[in-house]
Amino acid sequence: MISQFFILSSKGDPLIYKDFRGDSGGRDVAELFYRKLTGLPGDESPVVMHHDDRHFIHIRHSGLYLVATTSENISPFSLLELLSRLATLLGDYCGSLSEGTISRNVALVYELLDEVLDYGYVQTTSMEMLRNFIQTEAVVSKPFSLFDLSSVGLFGAETQQSKVAPSTAASRPVLASRSDQSQKNEVFLDVVERLSVLIASNGSLLKVDVQGEIRLKSFLPSGSEMRIGLTEEFCVGKSELRGYGPGIRVDEVSFHSSVLLEEFESHRILRLQPPQGELTVMRYQLSDDLPSPLPFRLFPSVQWDRGSGRLQVYLKLRCDLPPKSQALNVRLHLPLPRGVVSLSQELSGPEQKAELGEGALRWDLPRVQGGSQLSGLFQMDVPGLPGPPGQGHSATAPLGLGPASLSFELPRHTCSGLQVRFLRLAFRPCGSTSPHKWVRHLSHSDAYVIRI
């Protein structure tokens, strides 16, 4: 049983507020929660907080705070599960969960809360049941873009661009509008991996970890059967080997409760009948043993002068991806000693950009091709920088410099080597149009740290 539910923006602005029992301090409770949250040290706040006789349980999703309050002795895990389910429902009904979509669909959100919770007690979180009662249609904002015209050729003929999933396709509401009877039957399947790496100053690898998920977003009718074929060499644990190749190994794996595994052991096929909406089909983890080289290596060189306070940093970044692959939105973040007053730079490409900000150097590279090597020479004046004793120059890193961290995205690439071989649907709609299937592989950095 919960007393209140509210959604706050990242700045603490209340977007949604619902008082189920009338036994609280009103809307001031939301302001109290945000004051307690921002008053805590560090970036990681506890998901459960206490004030007087009231408990605050919250999750953060897409920059929003979803908060439930209660004065009862309730398991926090059950409330965290409820908040996670509410976040999924709001994303399914509104198309995506963000400050903009919530603001445009306030009436829809309140109608959902009225059906999910009655006097603070959970009634249902099943989309199959809720779709019979929710009458408000989602408001979807689609800004005009010239790129939308690129899919239309001469006399309306399709171009190659029309065969690519539109950027806003995966953010549509799962439930079709009553006035839109021509909504396509589509399935989006994403293999997403988060890479965490720690590299020592001598270049040796100290830690590597891959957290992977297979995410599904289905616009097909609930209960439509589908089969997902994974790489046949996929194995779990070090003792299991499959095929004649090197094998694609993970340490741990878990599946959604709706996944049937009769064909998994023999053919690495997952069979399921998912409901409409989003779900995580499979999660897996791999540590300390990647089948391929790390995507990036950094070779730093540091020179600093005792007398003038001049600091020179030369960075050489090598991309060890295959030549046909590329990394996007690459950013190198390098903390600097205090007191930097100027920066001069020499970059290896005109599309690159480097600037100072918040006590660090930010080096942005929009696109890095596999097998390429980029460099940057950065010279800074640090008047208050203490020089090394007994000598004018030093090649050791001064106090406050580093470690460097990288953020990037790797489209069509998985660090574990796991791939989706096929996605087959048993659903056959009326008419000649077959369901559209979109499969995407993506890796991105979670914590990619290189010591200087």
Curated annotation (Swiss-Prot):
Name the Gene Ontology biological process terms. autophagosome assembly; Golgi to lysosome transport; intracellular protein transport; protein localization; protein localization to basolateral plasma membrane; protein targeting
Tell me a GO cellular component.
trans-Golgi network
* Keywords recorded for this protein, A-Z: Endosome, Golgi apparatus, Membrane, Protein transport, Transport
Pfam families given in the database record:
Adap_comp_sub, Clat_adaptor_s
Q: What is its main location?
A: Golgi
Q: Which residues form the MHD domain?
A: 184-451
Q: What membrane topology is annotated for this entry?
A: Peripheral membrane protein
Gene3D superfamilies reported for this sequence: 3.30.450.60, Mu homology domain, subdomain B (2.60.40.1170)
Domain of life where this protein originates: Eukaryota
What subcellular locations does the record give? Golgi apparatus, trans-Golgi network membrane; Early endosome
How does this chain assemble? Adaptor protein complex 4 (AP-4) is a heterotetramer composed of two large adaptins (epsilon-type subunit AP4E1 and beta-type subunit AP4B1), a medium adaptin (mu-type subunit AP4M1) and a small adaptin (sigma-type AP4S1). Interacts with tyrosine-based sorting signals on the cytoplasmic tail of cargo proteins such as APP, ATG9A, LAMP2 and NAGPA. Interacts with the C-terminal domain of GRID2. Interacts with GRIA1 and GRIA2; the interaction is indirect via CACNG3.
Matching PANTHER family: AP COMPLEX SUBUNIT MU
Q: What does this protein do?
A: Component of the adaptor protein complex 4 (AP-4). Adaptor protein complexes are vesicle coat components involved both in vesicle formation and cargo selection. They control the vesicular transport of proteins in different trafficking pathways. AP-4 forms a non clathrin-associated coat on vesicles departing the trans-Golgi network (TGN) and may be involved in the targeting of proteins from the trans-Golgi network (TGN) to the endosomal-lysosomal system.
Q: What family is this?
A: Belongs to the adaptor complexes medium subunit family.
Q: How is this protein named in the record? A: AP-4 complex subunit mu-1
Organism (species): Canis lupus familiaris (Dog)
